[in-house]
Swiss-Prot record:
Stored InterPro entries: OPRT, Or_phspho_trans_dom, PRibTrfase_dom, PRTase-like
Cofactor: Mg(2+)
GO molecular function: magnesium ion binding; orotate phosphoribosyltransferase activity
Record-given protein name: Orotate phosphoribosyltransferase
Binding locations of orotate: F34, F35, T128, R156
């Protein structure tokens, strides 16, 4: 685990974005942890968040031409990532995002920001069912652009209805790389270093045994 990944886990815990307990997911599963990126909700939070996304993206080595933030959660994430890439890595990358409702006045259209073209890095918080990715792909393909990859905060490394995770299904269906700041394996590694979090480690490890994908 790299330093920025450890720092991100601590940041998420500090802001209560990452919590431990018993949480019922949309799938009906009872998860021992929950990640809610919507709680990164101040200017300082977003500035720090962008630095972690930028670090993971640079670390990935994937080539891309533009950041795309799907409405709504992806919009501030793509924006702060673009700023962090410029300020901390001297990489000036265009970005754009979509509107849920198309405008018929002013500049019109369903996209805001740079022209959607070339190799697109889609930026979001997490992938659960992959539905948002598939919706975004319709927009990307409609503009004759290509999906270079998907950048998210957390990969739960968890099976969907079959043996694959939602992320693995996206990789299979669209042939793109998925970049996550942290994976469940990183979280377990972090917990194993903290004696006071032994109970959380046991619960998360048991959950992975039951629902985790094969490495």
């Amino acid at each position: 685990m790299k330093a920025y990944q450890r720092e991100f886990i601590e940041f998420a815990l500090e802001r209560q974005v990452l919590r431990f307990g018993e949480f019922t997911l949309k799938s009906g599963r009872i998860s021992p942890y929950f990640f809610n990126a919507g709680l990164f909700n101040t200017g300082r939070d977003l500035a720090r968040l962008g630095r972690f996304y930028a670090a993971a993206l640079v670390d990935s080595g994937i080539d891309y031409d533009l950041l795309f933030g799907p409405a709504y959660k992806g919009i501030p994430i793509a924006t702060t990532t673009a700023v962090a890439l410029c300020e901390h890595h001297n990489i000036d990358i265009p970005y754009c995002f979509n509107r849920k409702e198309k405008k018929d006045h002013g500049e019109g259209g369903s996209l805001v920001g740079s022209e959607l073209k070339g190799r697109v890095m889609l930026v979001d918080d997490v992938i659960t069912a992959g539905t948002a990715i598939r919706e975004s792909m319709e927009i990307i393909e409609a503009h004759q652009a290509q999906l270079a990859g998907v950048l998210i905060a957390l990969d739960r490394q968890e099976k969907g209805k079959g043996e694959l995770s939602a992320i693995q299904e996206v990789e299979r269906d669209f042939g793109c790389g998925i970049v996550a700041i942290i994976k469940l394996a990183d979280l377990i590694s972090y917990l194993s270093e903290k004696p006071r979090m032994e109970a959380q480690l046991a619960a998360v490890s048991q959950y992975r045994e039951q629902y985790g994908i094969e490495a």
